[in-house]
Amino acid sequence: MGLITKLNESFGDTTLPQIRRDDFLSGDNNGVLFLGDFSDAFSWRGGTSTPTNGAVLYDIAEKNDAVLALFTNDGENIAGGGLDFAPDGVSPYSAATGVVELPAAVSSTIWNTGGTNEHNYAITMYGKFLDASWWDSDASIEQFMGSNIAYNTGDAWILAALQSGTNGDLSVRRDTGTSSQNSASSATGGRFKDNVSNAITQLVVHTYGDTLSWRYKTATTTVSGGGAALQTITHDYSSSKLQFGHSTAFGGDPRPLKRLYRMAVEDLTTSGRDPIAVADADWNRVISRFS
């Protein structure tokens, strides 16, 4: 007969690897501040129900849950593993809004990890863009990732957007003060508009190596750019809220982001990781989820 003893304590081998909800978190030294994914049942618990204001996108890192905001009931739904802004293929151009909004605690944490030009972070987004034939050539900026505050009006943090005009470039701007910023726009490797047309795209904006840089990747194209030295920040962006989707900070038409799948924010000062190496490994693990 065996002996069974019940203890009121638990014992564990601290040398065993920690099992995380998502491999993106493995080895992050607790530096990932947010990881959300509409194809993950823990993160998005709404199934295929119509997304509405106030719905929660739970943080897989279990720190900073996000909420859906600014939705105008313009046909948004859940499809292909992501939040679909335009099931009819037209609504992005009708001034529809809708974002995944992170709490200000994310911006505040990044702000407090370094001095005025030492905020090291990586922001990653997976999205699908509409066919470039739908995009127009006006001069507006269509933000799909960035602060809820416009860089030219207040204490914003970051912006990534389609810079329209005839070129259809990617515009990345790190706010350094009202109406001043580090700018790193795409002008090489082919036009952003053409490269991401009707494509599932991973975009990484980061300050690894103390430069403002970006990299976008599709199944057929990988383009990197930026590399500008970080300029001193003269305002406090810690109260701003990071948004993914169709923002109102810079929300001119067209709005070419069709689907939003997966988002992450990482404090590189804490994690010490190379964001591009992390992004490449993540792409290989998760890209098959999205359509």
Regions found by a protein language model. Name each.
Residues 193-217:
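Localized edge beta-strand/strand-to-loop motifs within extracellular or lumenal beta-rich domains
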Residues 33, 81-82, 86, 101-145, ...:
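A carbohydrate-recognition surface predominantly in extracellular/luminal proteins
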Residues 1-98, 276-291:
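Extracytoplasmic low-complexity segments
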Residues 19-27, 89-124, 188-192:
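Short surface loop/edge beta-strand patches of beta-sandwich-type extracellular domains
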Residues 39-41, 125-135, 150, 206-208:
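Solvent-exposed strand-to-loop "edge" motifs in beta-rich extracellular domains
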Residues 225-261:
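Flexible glycan-contacting loops in extracellular carbohydrate-active proteins
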Residues 171-202:
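Short, aromatic/His-centered strand-loop micro-motif at the edge of beta-sheets
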Residues 142-178:
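Glycan-recognition/cleft segments
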